[in-house]
Every structure is written in structure tokens, then in C-alpha cells.
């Protein structure tokens, strides 16, 4: 199936819907417990980075993740689940509020943690590739 096939749009949209709902549920779960640090966004970005690495490696190296499943899971679900724009906004809010420790921890931790999670996902997929 080509990327401009109508089913491709539906797969990405359905995955994005589910990823967005999952992100919202994570935010609800974390909201009472994280008044100072944006743990929900941090968590979904780290988890999403792992998933993108894991699923992309399987899609490239095996037949376990089909091109259609990759559209649904990686482009759709993970695209809806991860939150770069929220990450930037929450980082700017921490800086504006003078929370320089949390600002630094959040931005650097998200980048380093995201990279480590992505690479870990790739390594975790290797037994199947």
C-alpha cells in the first residue's frame, strides 16, 4: 500500500486518536501527584521514544511490523502520544516561573532520556531482527 492510499490516512488517524487518548489518560493519572514537575509529558515522551525505536527497528528489520502497522503505531499512535509542543510549552513555563532547576532537569532529562529510551527500544527489538 502506498503512503497516499486512503487507508494510510485512516490508519494514521486512528492511531493518532488512540495515542492522544492514551496521553490524556496518563495526564489524568499524574495530575494530582505532580504539582511542580511535568511528569506526565516527561513520561509519555520517554515511553513514546522507546516505542518509536522498538517498533521502527522491527518494521525495518523484520516482517513483524508491517508497513500498515507502522503507519498506525509509529506515525499515528506514537505521534499522538508524544508531546513535543507540550514539552516546549511546559519548559518555557518552568523557566518563566523561575524554576530553573526543574527547567534544566526537564529539558535535559527529556532529551537524554528520550535518546536512551529510543536506543533501548532499537536494542530490545534486535532479537526479532
Swiss-Prot record:
Na(+) binds at residues 79, 82. Na(+) is not transported, but it plays an essential structural role and its presence is essential for fluoride channel function. It holds the Pfam family CRCB. InterPro entries: FluC. GO terms for molecular function: fluoride channel activity; metal ion binding. GO terms for cellular component: plasma membrane. The keyword Transport applies. It is a multi-pass membrane protein. Its main location: membrane. It catalyses: fluoride(in) = fluoride(out). GO terms for biological process: cellular detoxification of fluoride. It is found in: Cell inner membrane. The chain crosses the membrane at residues 10-30, 35-55, 71-91, 105-125. The keyword Transmembrane applies. Keywords: Cell inner membrane, Cell membrane, Ion channel, Ion transport, Membrane, Metal-binding, Sodium, Transmembrane, Transmembrane helix, Transport. Belongs to the fluoride channel Fluc/FEX (TC 1.A.43) family. Fluoride-specific ion channel. Important for reducing fluoride concentration in the cell, thus reducing its toxicity. HAMAP family: FluC. NCBIfam families: crcB. This is Fluoride-specific ion channel FluC. The gene is fluC.
Amino acid at each position: 500500500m502506498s503512503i497516499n492510499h486512503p487507508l494510510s490516512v485512516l490508519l494514521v488517524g486512528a492511531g493518532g486518536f488512540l495515542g492522544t487518548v492514551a496521553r490524556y489518560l496518563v495526564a489524568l493519572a499524574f495530575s494530582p501527584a505532580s504539582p511542580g514537575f511535568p511528569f506526565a509529558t516527561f513520561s509519555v515522551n520517554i515511553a513514546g521514544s522507546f516505542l518509536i525505536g522498538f517498533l521502527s527497528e522491527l518494521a525495518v528489520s523484520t516482517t513483524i511490523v508491517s508497513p500498515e502497522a507502522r503507519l498506525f503505531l509509529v506515525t499515528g499512535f506514537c505521534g499522538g502520544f508524544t508531546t513535543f509542543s507540550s514539552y516546549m510549552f511546559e519548559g518555557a513555563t518552568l523557566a518563566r516561573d523561575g524554576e530553573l532547576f526543574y527547567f534544566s532537569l526537564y529539558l535535559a532529562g527529556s532529551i537524554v532520556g528520550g535518546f536512551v529510551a529510543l536506543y533501548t527500544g532499537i536494542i530490545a527489538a534486535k532479537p526479532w531482527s
